[in-house]
Each structure stands twice: as C-alpha cells, then as structure tokens.
Regions:
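Extended redox/cofactor-interaction regions of prokaryotic respiratory oxidoreductases
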Residues: 1-27, 31-32, 38-40, 69, ...
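Glycine-rich phosphate/diphosphate-binding loops that line cofactor/substrate pockets in enzymes
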Residues: 4-12, 153-154, 176-192
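Generic recognition of stable, solvent-exposed alpha-helical segments in well-folded globular domains
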Residues: 9, 23, 27-30, 37, ...
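Short, well-ordered beta-strand core segments
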Residues: 14, 42, 59-61
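Long, well-ordered, tryptophan-enriched scaffold segments
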Residues: 50-184
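Acidic/polar loop patches that form or flank catalytic/metal-binding clefts of enzymes
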Residues: 84-89, 173-175, 190-193, 221-231
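A glycine-rich phosphate-binding loop feature that marks nucleotide/adenosyl-phosphate handling sites
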Residues: 91-97, 180-181, 196-198, 228-239
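Conserved short loop/turn motifs at secondary-structure junctions
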Residues: 162-169, 195-203, 232-236
Length: 278
C-alpha cells in the first residue's frame, strides 16, 4: 500500500478493481466518496454489480480473470496518445535504460524459457552498462531497445478489438475508462487504484498488480497525494501489522531483520543495500 486511506480524498480519478470497497472496506470508501464529492471520477471494474458499483460514476463489467488484458489495453492507449508524465518517466523510472541485445519476446514468451522445466533463465534480462558499470540511458526514449520502446512494442498487440474480445467490455466503454484514467497523467492531476482479493487470489495476482504499477509509473502517479496503488486487505490487520513492523521478521519500512553475525551497521548495510556504480 503506497498511500493511506485518508489520502484517497486527494485523488482526481479512483479506479477500483478486484474489490467491493463499499461493503468490505467502508472506512476506506468514506474517503473515496469524499473525493467524489470534490469532483473526482470513481470507476468500478468488476464482473458483478455491487453496492460499490452503485456509488461509482459508472460500472464496467468484465469477464473474470481478464484484468491483465484490460490493463494492457490501457497501457497501449496511454502510450499511443502520449499521455505519459514525460519528466517522471525519464528521470524516475528505468524507461530510458537500454535493454541488452540478447533479450526479446516472441509468442508471449520472453527469452530464456525452458519448456521442460517451465522456468526462465534470466541471464539475458539485463540492461547495457558503460565502462564504469552504470546503465546506459537514452533520455529521448527513442532508442529502439530502451525499456520504453520495448514496452511500447510489447503492448502494441493490445488493440481495442483484441481487448474487447478477451474481456467482454465494449470498445466504447474501454475508451471511456482509458480516457478518464489516462487524464491523470497531467501534472496537476492524480489517479489511484484500489484492489483487494479479487486481484491477489488469482494465480496471476502479482502480475495484476505489476501491470497496474506500469500504468501508475507511466502517468507519474507514484509518490504523490491522491496517487499510488492501494491494497484493501482481506483481514483486519494485515496491512497495519506489516506497515508498522509488528511482525517478527521486519523492521520499520519493510527492512529485513539482521542476523546475529551482523554486529555493526556497516555489515548490515553491506548485506542488504543495493550495489550501484552511480
């Protein structure tokens, strides 16, 4: 959860997928309605029409399990219509980094797939580096193998016709959602996504969230009031116990616990700090 419930009131567009917030998370929904009272658009994408749907601006029924296709279409729409928050994408994501020439994707599979083991060898999943070991970047985002162009190529297949046929959502309704949420890429706007177990309990639950993370990064909706990706948990204190380090294996900020052998801060930092040549 990147933001807190009260911060939902600062959003200009709230996309609810994989959850029934009004019934299952009424306190969180209070702040969603506060945003709606201030003019925010609230969209509910769900196979069922629920109390949440009734309180939103509009409901989008889709086939269960087709969330990734739905979001993939939004990624293509954002890129094709140049709705990205360009400064954020260039300087605060890896979009400008150049992907190694050994990496590619064909027929839905990435390079390195082992058909017998059903696993990937990720040795080619790297970026090019200069003599100092620093990732090579193209801040124009025009290099054919920069992350942004590779992303554009990958999602080019998610046409409106294809997404509509997979999800069962009409092209007109898809465009309505994509236009409303894509508008949050403007510098004075913020959009947030709220999800619950309707996303996480799928076998592709992690991929659902990662796909939405791509959208939020493209629109610059991370790290701002009214933005982020926010979990509506299925148990009373799942989020609180992790955020406030009540669990035995975490320190504040989701930092890992040290081993007994790490008797100095330097040893702890050496073990857990990401190495960088920048």
């Amino acid at each position: 959860m990147t933001n807190h419930y009260i911060d939902l009131k600062n959003s200009d567009c709230i996309l609810i997928m994989g959850g029934n917030t009004a019934e299952n998370h009424p306190i969180a929904f209070k702040w969603i309605l506060r945003a709606k009272d201030k003019g925010a658009k609230v969209i509910h994408v769900d196979p069922r029409f629920t109390r949440t749907s009734a309180r939103c601006d509009y409901h989008v029924p889709l086939r269960s399990g087709t969330d990734i296709a739905f979001l993939g279409g939004m990624i293509k729409y954002i890129i094709d219509n140049n709705l990205i928050q360009e400064e954020y994408v260039k300087y605060y994501t890896n979009a400008s980094q150049i992907v190694s020439s050994g990496f590619d994707f064909q027929d839905g599979l990435f390079t390195g797939y082992d058909a017998e083991k059903h696993k990937y060898n990720k040795d080619t999943w790297t970026t090019e580096k200069d003599a100092a070991g620093i990732p090579v970047r193209d801040y124009t985002l025009q290099h054919p193998r920069c992350v942004y162009q590779m992303l554009k190529k990958h999602y080019d297949r998610y046409t409106l016709d294809k997404v509509s046929s997979i999800t069962g959502v009409s092209k007109e309704l898809l465009l309505r959602v994509y236009k409303d949420y894509g508008a949050t890429g403007a510098k004075d706007k913020a959009g947030t996504e709220c999800y619950a177990l309707g996303w996480t309990h799928h076998t592709v639950g992690s991929q659902n969230i990662r796909t939405m993370a791509i959208i939020q990064l493209l629109l610059g909706n991370m790290g701002i009031a009214g933005g982020g990706i926010n979990a509506l948990r299925g148990e009373p204190n799942v989020q609180g116990s992790t955020d406030h380090c009540i669990l035995y294996n975490l320190l504040p900020g989701y930092l890992k616990m040290p081993y007994a052998s790490m008797d100095t801060l330097a040893k702890y930092m050496d073990k857990y700090t990401t190495k960088s040549n920048d």
